[in-house]
Amino acid sequence: SMKEAGAGDLDAAFRALCARLEKAGVARRNINGVLQKVGARPMPRLPKRVGIVTSLSSAAFADIKQRIESSGYFLSKFICFDTLVQGKDAPASIIEALSLADNAGLDVIILARGGGSKEDLWCFNDENLARKILSLKTPIISAVGHEIDYSISDSVSDHRSITPTAAIADL
């Protein structure tokens, strides 16, 4: 008999988590078959306090900073929360950073990570992370990977941006 291995295991785990989230009633498939959060909140207009949860040493963070500076987006205060964005310890690190951000009196949180392989981005498909995102009081934008990348974090967030820099434009 044949067994899925490698990327096949990841795909099976992804589908299983999608099914659990649908069964729990917190996410459902849209007309295109993409899983989306039930009850997604609208993004605040002209947010004054924006949290950015990402690795402060990442290219994604550098790109976000450059986008903020070049866009003249100086009406908002940006508060950064450093976290791991890859590896087995990343989900717990992201959950901790999101907890800090959610209690910081922000108008919106951006969860950001640049592109990478399916394995590199896998931490954003963690069930505990998904449940943390669903529990946030603060609206959240998931800006993980590139346009072709899709994660559970995208599904359970209030808004998905196709890239970290696009999240600034989406504000």
Language-model features, listed with the residues they occupy:
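Short glycine/threonine-rich loop/turn motifs
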Residues: P47-L171
